[in-house]
Design a protein with these regions (language model features):
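RNase H-like polynucleotidyl transferase catalytic core
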Residues: 133-157
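RNase H-like, metal-dependent nuclease domains and their acidic two-metal-ion catalytic environment used
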Residues: 1-141, 161, 165, 169, ...
Length: 248
């Protein structure tokens, strides 16, 4: 790829890695905690970096991020909150085992983003008490506001509309991929259609949104790690000169 080529789609990241040409893999888990007759759901995605060679002027390694949904789970209504940390610990163990085979010399980073509203706060504390060493826990209070905020205790405030809108845009622009054959993919597709009809909130239709919110939380974590995955980056046309420095 030419250094002066106009880049469209997921943006190219010029990346200097201190331990070699392979960026660390990142796994993002989104956990939506259900109340009453709502299911809890867990969605897992991961970021892989597609190698685009090296910049011929700076010798920086060039990568494009690829975000793929790897797992979607809707837990039975009988699943107690006290069982959630055990489920998360098992998923982290599975991720570590899988990643050790895929990139044995590059350990994975894993982040769990939890919907901390309603019953979420005590679950967050249980998760923190049992978290494996390489798991970062990020509690999110989903708000009706208009902007993100940092709250006490490591919590973040994120508007619901922003989460859902970003997720839909990432799917539409190809920034987020999900195999159609994945279990619960069709259920998620139907949730998204329902949300599109009800202005990002299922309250009027009575439909569930647990898979969508879990996917939105995981996608939010991914865009924090790789801003190139955000829809704004996907539509931006930029000519790169120096490392991470646009010419104009």
């Amino acid at each position: 790829m030419s250094q002066n080529q106009i880049i469209e789609g997921p943006a190219v990241r010029l990346f200097n890695h201190p331990n070699g040409p392979v960026p660390a893999p990142k796994w993002n888990l989104g956990l939506d905690l259900g109340e009453r007759q709502d299911h809890s759901a867990l969605v897992i995605n991961d970021i892989e970096w597609q190698s685009l060679g090296r910049c011929y002027t700076t010798y920086a390694y060039k990568f494009a991020p690829i975000l793929t949904v790897r797992s979607m789970e809707r837990f039975p209504l009988s699943t107690g909150y006290q069982n959630i940390p055990l489920i998360i610990a098992e998923r982290v163990r599975q991720i570590n085992e899988h990643q050790s085979k895929r990139t044995p010399h590059v350990p994975a980073k894993i982040e769990l983003v939890v919907d901390a509203g309603g019953p979420g706060t005590p679950v967050v504390e249980m998760l923190r008490a049992m978290a494996p060493e390489n798991l970062t826990i990020t509690p999110v209070m989903i708000t009706s506001g208009t902007g993100e905020s940092r709250l006490k205790g490591g919590y973040h405030g994120v508007p619901r509309r922003d989460l859902v809108t970003r997720l839909i845009q990432m799917i539409a622009t190809g920034c987020l991929q999900c195999p159609a054959s994945m279990p619960n993919a069709l259920t998620w597709h139907n949730e998204l259609l329902s949300l599109s009809r009800t202005n990002t909130h299922p309250g009027e239709s009575g439909e569930h949104d647990d898979l969508t919110m879990a996917a939105a939380l995981a996608a939010w974590a991914a865009t924090r790690e790789a801003p190139e995955l955000s829809p704004a980056a996907a539509t931006k046309k930029t000519k790169y000169g120096f490392i991470d420095k646009p010419i104009f």
